[in-house]
């Protein structure tokens, strides 16, 4: 039998003193837990950087080549990733090489999550390899030396996979993208399909009034600041300055949003926060001549997308010499490397489609609508969708006739065949 309207349970009375007390206790507890996470972050940093070769890879690995032992030594190394228990690789399938950016942070973000770029390659049965690097550079190493080391790594991978059906697939993120493209332009015979994610290649390109990183470079007046910083560092450039550039793009997130997100979810967020901060705070160094070469020739000089770079051996670095299919993955939400910078090299080098065909070049590009710069190669959802599609269709991409193709990757629906 329904009760009358007078049978309602009365609402509890509001006591401001009780509410204030409960709020104060909650804030105190959150503050203590937040401070403890900060303590863990500091200890984690010291433990991480004390390692001989710190990285954030989620899979076990073994060292195959030490770049310090090459004829022109560098601080890079080639790792063979050990597949997880229960996963087998197919010796017939192309091996994969994932190369992470040396742009302030340490290595491993390409294999940071089990479902990331590395995990996708392993899950598809490919033999995975990773190009890592140490926090400190070899005193004499140059950008060209790193290119030669990458070529050595690919030669070693090819030698170890004589039954593979093709040359290695190379996945290069951010800074590693332009460096791998330079290597491929000089040694095209070593490369299978190349996937570059969030990699700047045309440095003057961009949308008017957008992407403040471009404007910051112009306002600071050229490369004098990197030269000064390297001098102050006794010939080394601290990668923490590059990370600071990331932070300065969104001070509200740096100073408030990221910290408040941890504070408000401190019971559940600590693990994710600490795992990301291990990579975000693990800074590395570059030699002064390395960063000066990068700034003068690429970001200020824009000589890569105009075939204006010449090696010390007299070889012109012309991206039109690349014989492998190039997959370019970028995002409209990337304010570090917006689509004009990732794709602008194509109109810089080719007047029309006929020139692309004449150079026998295959270019596939995909533009995400919203993901940020790091999400292009860190996000689990992007790995499960875009990177999964690139990997599973890599053989089809390899046999595409020359030309420029746009890849549109959509979610499956009930009507999808």
Regions found by a protein language model. Give the residues of each.
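Alpha/beta-hydrolase active-site loop
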Residues: 141-160
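Alpha/beta-hydrolase-fold enzymes
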Residues: 1-39, 165, 180-292, 401-405, ...
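Gly/Ala-rich beta-loop-alpha elbow adjacent to hydrolase catalytic centers
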Residues: 171-180
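Short beta-strand/loop motif that positions the catalytic acidic residue
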Residues: 322, 328-330, 334
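The conserved beta1-alpha1 loop
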Residues: 97-101, 174, 330-331
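Short beta-strand immediately N-terminal to the catalytic nucleophile in serine-hydrolase-like folds
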Residues: 170-172, 197, 329
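Short, surface-exposed "cap/lid" segments of acyl-processing enzymes
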Residues: 50-137
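Alpha/beta-hydrolase-fold serine-hydrolase catalytic core, especially in secreted/extracellular enzymes
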Residues: 1-16, 106, 134, 299-317, ...
């Amino acid at each position: 039998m329904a009760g009358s309207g007078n049978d309602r349970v009365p609402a509890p009375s509001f006591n401001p003193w009780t509410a204030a007390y409960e709020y104060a206790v909650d804030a105190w507890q959150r503050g203590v837990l937040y401070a403890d996470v900060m303590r863990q972050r500091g200890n984690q940093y010291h433990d991480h950087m004390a390692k001989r070769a710190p990285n954030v890879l989620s899979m076990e690995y073994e060292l195959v080549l030490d770049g310090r032992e090459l004829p022109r030594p560098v601080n890079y190394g080639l790792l063979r990733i050990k597949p997880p228990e229960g996963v087998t690789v197919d010796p017939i399938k192309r091996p994969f090489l994932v190369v992470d950016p040396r742009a302030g942070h340490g290595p491993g973000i390409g294999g940071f999550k089990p479902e990331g770029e590395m995990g996708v390659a392993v899950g598809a049965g490919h033999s995975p390899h990773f190009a890592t690097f140490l926090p400190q550079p070899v005193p004499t190493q140059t950008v060209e030396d790193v290119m030669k080391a990458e070529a050595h790594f690919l030669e070693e991978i090819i030698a170890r996979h004589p039954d593979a059906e093709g040359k290695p697939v190379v996945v290069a993120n951010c800074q590693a993208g332009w460096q791998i493209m330079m290597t491929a332009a000089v040694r095209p015979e070593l490369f299978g399909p190349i996937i570059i994610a969030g990699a700047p290649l045309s440095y003057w390109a961009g949308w008017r009034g957008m992407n403040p990183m471009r404007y910051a470079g112009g306002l600071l007046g050229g490369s004098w600041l990197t030269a000064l910083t390297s001098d102050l560092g006794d010939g080394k450039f601290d990668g923490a300055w590059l990370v600071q550039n990331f932070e300065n793009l969104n001070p509200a997130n740096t100073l408030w949003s990221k910290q408040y997100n941890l504070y408000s979810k401190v019971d559940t967020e600590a693990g994710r926060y600490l795992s990301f901060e291990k990579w975000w705070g693990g800074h590395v160094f570059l030699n002064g001549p390395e960063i000066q070469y990068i700034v003068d020739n690429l970001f200020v000089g824009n000589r890569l997308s105009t075939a204006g770079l010449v090696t010390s051996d007299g070889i012109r670095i012309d991206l039109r010499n690349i014989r492998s299919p190039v997959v370019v993955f970028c995002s409209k939400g990337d304010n570090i490397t917006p689509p004009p910078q990732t794709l602008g090299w194509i109109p810089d080098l080719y007047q029309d489609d006929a020139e692309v065909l004449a150079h026998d070049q295959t270019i596939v590009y995909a533009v995400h609508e919203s993901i940020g710069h790091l999400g292009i190669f860190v996000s689990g959802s992007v790995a499960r969708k875009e990177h999964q599609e690139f990997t599973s269709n890599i053989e089809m991409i390899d046999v595409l006739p020359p030309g420029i193709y746009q890849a549109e990757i959509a979610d499956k629906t009930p009507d999808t065949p």
